[in-house]
Amino acid sequence: MLAVGCASSQALGMQGHSNPNRELLDAAALCRELVPEGSVEAFLADHRQELFPDELFVDLFPSGRGRPSVPSDVIATVMVLQALEGLSDRDAARALRDRISWKVACGLSLDDEGFHHSVLTYWRARLRTSERPERIFDAVRAVVDATGVLQGKNRRALDSTLLDDAVATQDTVTQLVSAIRRVRRMIPGAAQAPLVAHDYEAGPKPLIAWDDPVAKQQLVSALVGDAHKLIQALESPELTVEQQEAVGLLALVAGQDVEPGEAEGTWRIAERVAPDRVISTVDPEARHMHKSRSSYRDGYKAHVAVEPETGLVTACSLTPANAADGPAGVALIADEDPGLEVLADSAYGSGEVRAALEQTKHRAVIKPIPLHTAVLGGFTIDDFAIDTSAGTATCPRGTTVAITPHGNAVFGPRCRDCPLRERCTRSRTGRAIRLHPHHDLLLAARRQAKTGGFKDSYRRHRPMVERSIAWLVARGHRRVRYRGVARNQLGLSMRVAAINLRRLINLGLDHDGGWVLQT
């Protein structure tokens, strides 16, 4: 039986192993028929030790001494089921204690009380700090490779989705007060600095008339002044890494939302928003991102690459919400063999992404970024004849100019008496075009998008990635559970592993001396 104690009594020590001998009240022996065939629980009951062998986790227990841990195949099974159902650690531990299907999946007896929920936190910490934090995802991916289900399937669809942060977004005042308090708490002597804007030992926010803009500006100015005083008082090379990070975060929040005021030494809220603005001192890695002018989220972004015929996720990554889709998408297929057909929407349509795919000998089936016109309904750059090899640009009227070394084609005074001027430019100085460094690639992409082959392939194969993302965020997974990129990357990889395993089971996964698909 598993112990029910806390993590420190269960998880420390040497690696535990599942007992190969069945106990008197073995759940699988007594209740296996209650677990539906074809379910993830039934599959794990039969094959969890082949999927998650002890050797997969042996490096997490280098000492080989002490009390045995919870068996690794049991922990991995619980983590997969937890990710599949979107349960908290507490609810997952409760499910292991009172659900027959979970006991069957983990090979426990009916009277086994399971383990304390903090054991899951401990194991995630060990995984995260190990050399292979995503080994459960890798184990499922190894099964994918062993079955050969992806053999000959040379398409990958890329997409991303925004995930809500696990903490509340903070305003400027809250961030400043929180960051100052953190520094005062973490660094000995910091509380002695003469700060005047607020009583930082008090719990509530500063007491002012919050509907008075002048009072709010004065408070912000005073808080920024306190932050600068505190930073200057702590310029010491003897700070620990954690203390340096706290001071660095204080410096960041003290500068990201403000600009110098009219009077010397004063500060005011800036009208612009910092492009990489920290939205919370509780989770400094989360970011703000607009999906459209009216739709936005604070948190992170999940990126996936999907094989569109099977729906299997071949790679995943997590970034702050404001990270660009293109570079993340290219990284997802970096380890793939050349010759893929890569499908994606226009968020991946930059010249840099197309150049990277061309360099790695992949074929892009990516929607082009829409062109903008200087005049509504007027000429776009595609109406100009651009010859990059000759270094010339010819306008719709037939006027040709040289392209400058910086990629500019300036028609200037040649537009003065042009009968097509109203369809081309409103500028008094005439039309000027700035060519993208990858102009030829972008032009080819726009032409490709008009072909029947592009449209057929895109419509047929790309929708699966959107379905995969719908599976990914179901059961409450639109909101991340943890703080920081590393923790949530591990959570994302666990969720993807669970989804991939369920998909493989639906495709007929079995183990008969090796992993095979029976369909």
Please provide the spans of the model-predicted regions.
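Intrinsically disordered, low-complexity and often Lys/Arg-enriched segments
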Residues: 1-26, 511-519
